[in-house]
A protein has these predicted regions:
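Membrane-interface loop-to-helix entry segments
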Residues: 99-119, 182-190
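Haloarchaeal acidic low-complexity proteome signature biased toward cell-envelope/secretome components but also
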Residues: 1-27, 60-65, 130-133, 201-220
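Interfacial helix-loop-helix junctions of multi-pass membrane proteins
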Residues: 86-95, 147-189, 193, 197
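Internal alpha-helical transmembrane segments of multi-pass membrane proteins
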Residues: 127-147
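Transmembrane alpha-helix boundary signature
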Residues: 60, 82-93, 104, 120, ...
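Alpha-helical transmembrane segments of multi-pass membrane proteins
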Residues: 76-81, 114-118, 145-157
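Cytoplasmic-side transmembrane-helix entry/capping segments in multi-pass membrane proteins
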Residues: 42-45, 64-76
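Short, hydrophobic transmembrane alpha-helix segments
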Residues: 28-41, 55-62
Length: 220
């Protein structure tokens, strides 16, 4: 049984929540333009681009996107963008005032990356009969791909922060020190473990669609 079934959350409610998050991202974009704050503008704009992916994948590639998956992706980018805005009228963002906000968004973002890795490796496994990927291998693969992406992201944060300091502009991404980086990676692993353990519940349809597309391409 899925979490939404236990909580009694309908698909309509999930779709509305995802839509409200998109509206919220538009609002954050205008807040960033009004302040003006480059970090808010960039993070809100990237978030708006990402939340279009589920409908794009479903419309152009026939990959079924459950409302829960769409809400999952929307939540990750929405909370990240919201963290750069904070409470209206305040000088400080949630990333600066709430110590756990950065770790929450890292776990959510990592779970989305892990889901993409899980769906891909399971689709390859189902597509080719000559390939057999044991569950343990899939689990480890998802962990490794997520950790690798997490390390890349931390390096990117550091590079952008240093470049912004050199040119004297506002940093789009902020790094808060080595200890924070290590904790971020720990929460990345938490997100990956959740997906690697329970990914079958939510990603079966996506895996099936990807495997079908791989088979269709191989037959051409």
């Amino acid at each position: 049984m899925r979490i939404r079934d236990r909580l009694g959350i309908s698909e309509t409610t999930q779709k509305r929540a995802a839509w409200l998050m998109q509206v919220g991202l538009v609002g954050m974009l205008f807040i960033g333009l009004d302040r003006p704050n480059l970090g808010i503008v960039v993070n809100a704009a990237v978030g708006l681009a990402v939340v279009q992916l589920p409908s794009l994948l479903e419309r152009d590639y026939q990959i079924p996107m459950d409302p829960a998956l769409t809400l999952w992706i929307s939540s990750a980018v929405f909370l990240h963008a919201l963290g750069t805005v904070g409470i209206p009228g305040s000088r400080y963002s949630f990333y600066e005032t709430l110590w756990w906000w950065d770790h929450l968004t890292h776990a959510l973002s990592a779970s989305v990356v892990a889901a993409a890795g899980y769906a891909t490796v399971r689709a390859v496994d189902r597509h080719n009969d000559r390939i057999y990927l044991p569950p343990r291998f899939t689990f480890v693969f998802v962990l490794l791909i997520t950790i690798a992406f997490g390390v890349f992201w931390e390096v990117l944060e550091f590079a952008i922060a240093q470049a912004s300091a050199l040119v004297g502009s506002t940093s789009v991404l902020t790094q808060y020190g080595l200890g924070d980086t290590m904790l971020d990676l720990v929460f990345d692993v938490v997100g990956a473990v959740i997906v690697a353990t329970w990914g079958t519940v939510y990603l079966t349809d996506v895996v099936g669609a990807l495997a079908t597309r791989l088979s269709a391409r191989a037959e051409r």
